[in-house]
């Protein structure tokens, strides 16, 4: 019954997104049943339509459980998406918590040849471990977030998970983008209410500011080509997810945005369309304002003049 309920929730989320029609949603399934950290029998009977599993904002702590999950995913052609965090270590060392679980999961990916996608990588140690895993032939991909490229722990005390890191970590991520180690940029969008944020909930909104932050930081300041940013935010994510998107070619979905690269704009959190406004970019001056969004050939958003 638990497995049936899990699949019903997945199907309902995707159905609701299709009804709204503003973006495509591909819902994942948990690695362990009900996030209990140990039960993985459901992985053997997942329908073929399930291509990704994740424990969301937790890491699977038990090594044997995670190893068995990787073995099953290799047989079932499923990609593991990992939030790397050793929950026993994170109360006293967030950095080590990310690094040590990144290393473990990369080794499991190499050993079982299981596709692994590392989410919101934030430390030098983690990105270097991923680089080494790729060099050894592990089928690993990874992403970084706009906020981990923009802020340092000296400039922002906003609570997110993984935390905002040091300037050295930020530079390591940018260097990894430049060298091709980073496959994608993703937002880790978390629209928590003001009440939840006051209670200490980790996360921030990031979808609407993502392109402007990355274009300003990577292209305007670091001199990286726009084509690379487009690859990181569109083409490569679509490839990782197996979607016919990210290219303006016959056979691909007509999903794209129109942006103004030349006119600076100031982020106003009160004008965001998200259900919450927990945005640390409020007041930042950016380039790359999104003027219009087209999905499936239909205009779904147009900025005010």
What role is predicted for each listed range?
Residues 13-31:
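A glycine-rich helix N-cap at a beta->alpha junction
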Residues 12-19, 127-142, 195-208, 238-246:
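Short, electropositive alpha-helical surface patch
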Residues 40-185:
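Histidine/acidic residue-rich metal-binding segments in metalloenzymes
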Residues 154-160, 195-200, 272-277:
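Short glycine/proline- and charge-enriched loop/turn segments
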Residues 253-305:
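C-terminal cap of metal-dependent C-N hydrolases
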